[in-house]
């Protein structure tokens, strides 16, 4: 199947090995993992960054290769339970940040047709994601606009 905004096909990659339980060398208490997840969220880390930190640094010096295997919950579920989640989903937030950067670039370089198209594609993805999240993680009346995105992220 082709990519969304190009005619290229996707490249296949390796799959993560399936596992039903965490490895023996990574035995950390579930509560300690959840506390560390909330602590990292309060420091300003996104859920994907929290997963990387736990994988690389771990909890109490012991790496946690997969939070869901260790706790039975995803990082975002842990954040929701502890009221530490962001107001915007991470993927939508990242796309909005990209759109803001592209819009500022277009203001400085109005003749840059390639990045004008990149901005259009990014804003299309944002609108598509807003439709997906509207009513669940976003308000029913939420609509994307550059000014609104800039206010929310700064």
UniProtKB/Swiss-Prot annotation:
| A Pfam family of this chain | Ribosomal_S15
Compositional bias (Basic residues) spans? 1-10
Annotated disulfide bonds: none
Gene Ontology CC entries for this record: cytosolic small ribosomal subunit
Keyword field contains Ribonucleoprotein: yes
The record's SMART domains line, in alphabetical order, gives:
Ribosomal_S13_N, Ribosomal_S15
GO BP annotations of the record are: translation
Chain residue ranges for the region called Disordered: 1-32
GO MF annotations, alphabetized: small ribosomal subunit rRNA binding; structural constituent of ribosome
Q: Where is the composition biased (Acidic residues)?
A: 21-32
Annotated InterPro entries:
Ribosomal_uS15, Ribosomal_uS15_arc_euk, Ribosomal_uS15_N, uS15_NS1_RNA-bd_sf
Subunit description: Part of the 30S ribosomal subunit.
Q: What family classification does the UniProt entry report for this protein?
A: Belongs to the universal ribosomal protein uS15 family.
State the protein's name: Small ribosomal subunit protein uS15
Origin organism is Natronomonas pharaonis (strain ATCC 35678 / DSM 2160 / CIP 103997 / JCM 8858 / NBRC 14720 / NCIMB 2260 / Gabara)
For this protein's source organism, the top of the classification is: Archaea, Methanobacteriati, Methanobacteriota, Stenosarchaea group, Halobacteria
């Amino acid at each position: 199947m082709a990519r969304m905004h190009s005619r290229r096909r996707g490249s296949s990659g390796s799959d993560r090995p399936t596992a039903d339980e965490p490895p023996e060398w990574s035995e950390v208490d579930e509560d300690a993992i959840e506390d560390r997840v909330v602590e990292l969220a309060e420091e300003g880390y996104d859920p994907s960054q929290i997963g990387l930190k736990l994988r690389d640094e771990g909890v109490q010096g012991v790496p946690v290769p997969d939070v869901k295997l260790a706790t039975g919950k995803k990082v975002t579920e842990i954040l929701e339970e502890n009221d530490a989640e962001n107001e915007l989903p991470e993927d939508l937030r990242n796309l909005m940040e990209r759109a803001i950067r592209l819009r500022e670039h277009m203001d400085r370089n109005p003749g840059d047709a390639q990045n004008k198209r990149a901005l259009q594609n990014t804003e299309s993805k944002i609108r598509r994601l807003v439709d997906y999240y509207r009513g669940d993680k976003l308000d029913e009346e939420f609509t994307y606009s550059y000014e609104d995105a800039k206010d929310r992220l700064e």
